[in-house]
Regions:
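Membrane-integrated ABC transporters
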Residues: 1-55, 70, 74-81, 99-103, ...
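An intracellular "coupling" helix at the cytosolic face of ABC transporter transmembrane type-1 domains
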Residues: 31, 35, 39, 127-128, ...
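Transmembrane helices of ABC transporter permease
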Residues: 36, 40-53, 155-209, 283-297, ...
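Transmembrane helix-loop-helix hairpins at lipid-water interfaces of multipass membrane proteins
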Residues: 41-95, 102, 175-182, 280, ...
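Helix-loop-helix
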Residues: 70-79, 173-187, 263-334, 339-340
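Cytoplasmic coupling helices
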Residues: 101-120, 158-162, 185-226, 240, ...
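ABC-type nucleotide-binding domain
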Residues: 348-349, 355-607
Length: 607
């Protein structure tokens, strides 16, 4: 990370009071996620409606059994009514299974769409985003936040429709039986709704805090349990300290998990107790009407009504809990939408230019660059042309903008002034495929996947044959070493290639780039971290790679750039000098001073 780069923060307003007006819009946005599956959801709706209608029929059949079939001794009618009750139970179960199958499939497809959308968005984000964001934070958004939505998108939405339909159908049936008892049953419903909404808001707030803590813990795990993190922790004797730090992070998560689980639990339990006690209230109310001489309620009607009321209890409580769950899930959706709403600064033009044949001429035309408006300029007025097939070396002190300049060519960053061209075309006008085919990068920090040697090389060219892979490895002078391994090209390289030495990893990276065969090559201090003997072997591989290509070399060791066609010396983001090695030495300026520094390093003071 560059010292003048600001730390990335999520877009403001997602978790503030100012966001109070956002939930309706966010709910509409969530509903749009289900739009591609509206046909299947319509089938679910039909199944839900059919299930609700069938389920409320059973109490009416029960009433007829108690008020007609049994008192009148009509055994035939009794048999038919009993079979009807059995049939309603079977139909309700079948409808429920089909409903669960379809809704779960739709929910999992929505989860897949969300994960893919977030990953695609992150793939499009500029390099600056990843230099400012902890890897664990990114992983947590995809794993924990989207994973936390699973219950909502797979069952909560369907549960909401199912329970709402069941409640409406049951209330209508209760009104048909006795409107007075129905009014008594529903008197406290507004209070219950108000309580559930308050509990939902409380859980949403705690869920936001919990997900942030989970992201922080994931970042800690990613950093400290990587190969580099383990090596650093053990060699510095800080393993116990890291363990203690993780335990503290985990302890904070424990507190938030308990608070999230218990938020509003007593209030929701009170609702459950009251609703469970309602049958007793109904029996009491029916008894009062009978004792007062008012229109009596038949035993069959009373039993059917209480059966409906008990049937109302489960979907009503579930409906209130679903409301709480949806409020909680809004916090997760907000965190995902933060990523989906990030501005992608580097985009492909509407009508991009595609170069079929790339010569490789690179030109920096009065280029300015800064990471943002608050930081000062990193590059100012860079003006240099690199003819196709020639080499340019960029040297200078640490922080002078060398790597940044090279990253403007493949559009890892975009210029803030001037332009960079490839074969006379502004790189911002080219399609991404042209840039990917045109430019290959070999950097000091070689990245290898935890896969086989062959798979790592094929990342550059998925359809490469074994002969092409071996030829690239030979050119990079790494074939003999690979062939000496027990598994050869099937050898797993380990996380980030830690089963290979630094020089071996560099040569694997060079072989991968050779396989890609780009006309433009960027060497970003590719040998600066190697010992002299390894550097010589890698340099030979680089020489083979560079032959006939336009090459931009970012150099720390000036001995590697003496043969460059052009050398540019950057100082404070400006091109202080330009020329060949001999020309710059004759000027006895900044380049000559750097050469002298490399040849006569300052003595280290004695302790």
């Amino acid at each position: 990370m560059k010292p003048d780069e600001p730390t990335w923060t999520p877009p403001p307003g997602a978790h503030t009071a100012a966001a109070a007006d956002r939930p309706p819009a966010e709910v509409r946005r969530i509903l749009r996620l289900f739009h591609p599956y509206r046909g299947r959801l319509a089938v679910v709706g039909l199944l839900v409606g059919a299930s609700s209608l069938v389920s409320v029929a059973s109490p009416f059949l029960l009433r007829e059994i108690l008020d007609t079939a049994i008192p009148q001794g009509r055994t035939g009618l009794l048999t038919l009514l009993a079979l009807g009750m059995i049939l309603t139970a079977v139909m309700t179960s079948v409808f429920g299974v089909l409903q669960t199958l379809i809704s779960t499939t739709v929910g999992q497809r929505v989860m897949h769409d969300l994960r893919t959308a977030v990953y695609t968005q992150l793939q499009r984000m500029p390099l600056a985003f990843f230099t400012r964001t902890r890897t664990g934070e990114v992983q947590s958004r995809i794993a924990n936040d989207i994973g936390g939505m699973q219950a909502t998108v797979t069952s909560t939405a369907t549960s909401l429709v199912s329970n709402l339909t069941a409640v409406i159908a049951t209330v209508v049936a209760m009104l048909a039986l006795d409107w007075r008892l129905t009014v008594v049953s529903l008197l406290l419903l507004p209070v219950f709704v108000a309580i559930s909404r308050r509990v939902g808001r409380e859980r949403k707030r705690i869920t936001t805090q919990r997900q942030k803590q989970m992201a922080a813990m994931a970042a800690t795990v990613t950093e400290s349990l990587s190969v580099s993190g383990i090596l650093l922790g053990r060699t510095m004797g800080r393993s116990d300290s890291l363990t203690q730090g993780f335990a503290e992070e985990s302890e904070r998560l424990v507190d938030l998990e308990v608070r999230s689980s218990m938020a509003g639990r007593w209030r929701m339990s009170t609702i459950g107790i009251v609703m469970a006690a309602m049958p007793a209230v109904i029996y009491w109310a029916a008894g009062l009407t009978f004792a007062s001489g008012a229109a009596a309620v038949s035993i069959g009607t009373l039993v059917a009504f209480v059966t409906l009321q008990q049937g109302l209890f489960r979907p009503a409580v579930s409906l209130l809990s679903t409301g709480v769950q949806m409020q909680t899930s809004l916090a997760l959706f907000q965190r995902i939408f933060e990523y989906l709403d990030l501005t992608v600064d580097i985009t492909e033009p509407e009508k991009p230019v595609r170069l079929e044949k790339i010569r490789g001429e690179i030109a920096f035309e009065d280029v300015d660059f800064s990471y943002d408006e608050k930081s000062g300029p990193t590059l100012t007025g860079i003006d240099v042309t690199v003819p196709a097939g020639s080499s340019l070396a960029v040297v200078g002190s640490t922080g002078s903008g060398k790597s940044t300049l090279s990253y403007l060519v493949p559009r890892l960053y975009d210029v803030t002034g001037g332009r960079v061209t490839l074969d006379g075309v502004d790189v911002r006008d080219l399609d991404f495929d042209t840039l990917a085919r045109a430019v290959g990068v070999v950097s000091q920090e070689t990245y290898l996947f935890h896969a086989s040697v062959a798979d790592n090389l094929r990342f550059a060219k998925p359809d490469a044959t074994e002969e092409e892979i071996e030829a690239a490895a030979r050119a990079a002078q790494i074939h003999d070493h690979i062939a000496s391994l027990p598994d050869g090209y099937d050898t797993l390289v380990g996380e980030r290639g830690y089963r290979f030495s630094g020089g071996e990893k560099q040569r694997l990276a060079i072989a991968r780039t050779i396989l890609r065969d780009p006309p433009v090559l960027i060497l970003d201090e590719a040998t600066s971290a190697l010992d002299t003997r390894t550097e010589q072997a890698v340099q030979q591989a680089i020489d083979a790679l560079s032959a006939g290509r336009t090459t931009l070399t970012i150099a720390h060791r000036l001995s590697t750039v003496r043969d460059a066609d052009q050398i540019v010396v950057l100082e404070d983001g400006r091109a202080a000098e330009r020329g060949t090695h001999e020309e710059l030495l004759d000027r006895d300026g900044r380049y000559a001073a750097l050469i002298h520094r490399d040849s006569h390093p300052a003595p280290v003071p004695a302790p």
